[in-house]
């Protein structure tokens, strides 16, 4: 058994604990009651559901230090609020990505959600591009998906990506908790 000075766990604040079950039946890697063994928790996403999640966490482990992270797009100014968009991604939290885009008042007309680490075929990308043409939309994906597609020699002329960074709220609290060691 290993001893850790600090134990962190991370959740997306939209998906949170999903159906509450562990793998393979649910998204959790261990039972939610094991949060009693952790010092710190990261809730990342778009600042939704934080109060309800925080109350539940405090019931399980009142000693948890909760850190909040928000995804911030760094190139959002490259996209016009006057345009319509089709969004696609193959990431673990597609809805977090879509909500981030919508929070910046971009009009998402259609979205395509694929499994995490998805390997897109040329036909699938062509389908998205044709749909965008038919709906007079521009196409947005994640930087991660864009890079994955670019390795497959797929034409990327119509596809743009959002660069996003995780901004830790109250970063000083996190740094101080690490320095205390």
Regions found by a protein language model. Give the residues of each.
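Phosphate/Mg2+-binding loops and adjacent switch elements
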Residues: 1-61
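Short, conserved loop/helix-junction motifs that constitute active-site signature segments
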Residues: 2-3, 32-37, 60-61, 79-80, ...
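Conserved beta-strand/loop subsegment of P-loop NTPase cores
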Residues: 8-11, 35-45, 58-71, 77-82, ...
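Residue-level signal for inorganic ion chemistry
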Residues: 38, 90, 139
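Short, charged/polar "capping" segments at the starts of alpha-helices
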Residues: 47-55, 95-96, 146-151, 170
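Redox- and metal-dependent alpha/beta enzyme cores, enriched for Fe-S-associated oxidoreductases
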Residues: 79-122
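Short, flexible loop segments at boundaries between secondary-structure elements
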Residues: 115-118, 156-181
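A short, acidic, amphipathic alpha-helical segment used as a generic capping/interface helix at domain edges
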Residues: 119-137, 144-146
């Amino acid at each position: 058994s290993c001893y850790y000075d600090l134990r962190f766990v991370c959740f997306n604040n939209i998906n949170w604990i999903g159906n509450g079950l562990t793998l393979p039946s649910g998204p959790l890697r261990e039972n939610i009651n094991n949060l009693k063994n952790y010092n710190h928790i990261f809730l990342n996403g778009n600042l939704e559901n934080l109060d309800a999640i925080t109350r539940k966490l405090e019931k399980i482990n009142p000693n948890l230090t909760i850190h909040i992270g928000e995804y911030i797009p760094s190139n959002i100014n490259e996209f016009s609020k006057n345009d319509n968009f089709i969004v696609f991604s193959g990431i673990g939290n597609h809805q977090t990505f879509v909500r981030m885009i919508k929070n910046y008042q971009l009009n998402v007309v259609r979205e395509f959600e694929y499994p995490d680490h998805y390997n897109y075929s040329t036909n699938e990308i062509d389908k998205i591009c044709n749909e965008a043409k038919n709906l007079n939309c521009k196409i947005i994906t994640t930087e991660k998906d864009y890079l994955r597609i670019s390795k497959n020699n797929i034409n990327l002329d119509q596809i743009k990506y959002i660069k996003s960074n995780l901004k830790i709220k109250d970063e000083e609290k996190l740094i101080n908790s690490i320095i205390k060691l």
